[in-house]
Amino acid sequence: MCNRARPNPNNDAVYSLSINSDTHVMKPESATLAAISVGAPTFSQEAVSRAIEAQFGLIGEYSPLVSERDQNFMLRADDGGHFVAKVTSGLEEAAATDFQVEALLHLEVKGGLNVPRAVRTKAGETFGEISDDNGSYRLRVVTWVDGEPLESQGLNERSVCNFGAALARLDKAFAGYTHPGENPALLWDLQRVLELRELIDYISDSSARKSVTQAADDFENRVLPVLGDLRYQVIHSDANPGNILLADDRIGFIDFGDIVKAPLVFDVAIAMSYLRSFDANPLKFMVPFVAAYHAVNPLDAREADVLFDLVRARLTTTITLLYWRLSARAENDAYRQKALEVESGAGRFLAILDSIGRSEFREKLAFIQ
């Protein structure tokens, strides 16, 4: 039973970040890096509104939303409906976009989950289209999910228990879903963490750079050899507190743009990497979260054995891309600013995990055998 606890204000601890003065913007050398370097499309609100009205039949008030790759708007329709309109990144493969839409349709059939629903065009299609001088872009609409982001409310034992159980139900619903586009080229995919080694030099803080290097080495030496022993399925892959919505005790999930087929335990580790406590008990949110997940969708010992290195690998991804983004995107870039605000505690928490060590971490999860 999860007892309500007072939110810990220290969860929002931030430390300053800077980049070396001689750091230059990296020219993308791979599809994965290019996908997050170019920013979202930049259609005018009026152009999107016209396209949505013509193809989806929705009219209303638009407000821009911050996004890494897609151009998103909140749409309050005149008929009372509440939606998100999405102009998909021009670098995203059509198969990857279809994978995301079909995933939402799959979850809708499963039922019982608080997730967006795909809205079809007037012609019954799952995509529309919007064009400019640079070409055509896929246009989507999904329903709005009510609730406040977990990141804005502070963590407590009750909320993380609800989060863990809800993520377990989501993963169970995803089991059995397959699609030709289930392996998109995304640097946020934890399976690609070793590709980030080429960006580690962007980390100007020597202590953080050392921790990230060690975490990447540990992933290579401890996780890669056992990946074949783990359960694979489609996972959300980005269950961070900004994508987790809380309305009373009901959990909602948004942003399915990073879904991928990967080891199931990756979904647990990714979520854990954001359940940070900076007081005397750094794991006080992680352990009840895992226990709640395990009660609904049991993990096995092999999965629990790699959680320490997987959490550190996700923090490595977060830290490396944060420092790289400082140089790769303009200072007034909205996603860059949001990432700085939300993620600047990742390096500090990675150092805390390093001090705890693999053995003590695993002992805290001894209920998984």
How would you name each of these model-derived features?
Residues 68-80, 84-85, 118, 220-266, ...:
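Active-site acidic catalytic loop and adjacent metal/ATP-binding pocket
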Residues 24-58:
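Juxta-kinase regulatory segment immediately upstream of eukaryotic protein kinase catalytic domains
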Residues 150-208, 232:
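A cross-family kinase active-site recognition segment
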Residues 202, 320-369:
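ATP/Mg2+ or Mg2+-diphosphate-binding catalytic cores
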Residues 265-298, 312-330:
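Active-site activation/catalytic loop segments of kinase-like enzymes and analogous catalytic loops
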Residues 57-73:
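ATP-binding glycine-rich phosphate-binding loop
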Residues 78-178:
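ATP-binding pocket architecture of kinase catalytic cores
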Residues 41-54, 176-180, 194-237, 298:
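An alpha-helical support segment within catalytic cores of ATP-dependent transferases
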